[in-house]
């Protein structure tokens, strides 16, 4: 059977908990109550901020150089 990878598979064990914690912290900072009753815009703002912070963290780890 072929090895099937999904782009949603986490490569680092324990990353899911760290990302969930980040999501809760950002939602709190933004005053967003995550859930089904929250607008897509509000929930999306949290996801967008997570992406910005993860990219920033990766850039810092790489010392600003692109590989």
Curated annotation (Swiss-Prot):
**At what residues does the UniProt record annotate the site feature described as Cleavage?**
25-26
Q: Which domain of life is it from?
A: Bacteria
The record, for Pfam families, names: SASP
UniProt KW keywords: DNA-binding, Sporulation
GO BP terms: namely: DNA topological change; sporulation resulting in formation of a cellular spore
What would be an example GO MF term here?
Answer: double-stranded DNA binding
PROSITE patterns for the chain: SASP_1 (PS00304), SASP_2 (PS00684)
Q: Which family does it belong to?
A: Belongs to the alpha/beta-type SASP family.
Which miscellaneous remark does the UniProt record hold? SASP are degraded in the first minutes of spore germination and provide amino acids for both new protein synthesis and metabolism.
According to its UniProt entry, what is the function of this protein?
A: SASP are bound to spore DNA. They are double-stranded DNA-binding proteins that cause DNA to change to an a-like conformation. They protect the DNA backbone from chemical and enzymatic cleavage and are thus involved in dormant spore's high resistance to UV light.
This protein is called Small, acid-soluble spore protein B
Organism equals Bacillus subtilis (strain 168)
Query: Lineage in the entry?
Result: Bacteria, Bacillati, Bacillota, Bacilli, Bacillales
């Amino acid at each position: 059977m072929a090895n099937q990878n999904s782009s949603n598979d986490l490569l680092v064990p324990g990353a899911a908990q760290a990302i969930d914690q980040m999501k809760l912290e950002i939602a709190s900072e933004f005053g967003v109550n995550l859930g089904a009753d929250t607008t897509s815009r509000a929930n999306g703002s949290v996801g967008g901020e997570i992406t910005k912070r993860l990219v920033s963290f990766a850039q810092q780890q790489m010392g600003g150089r692109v590989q």
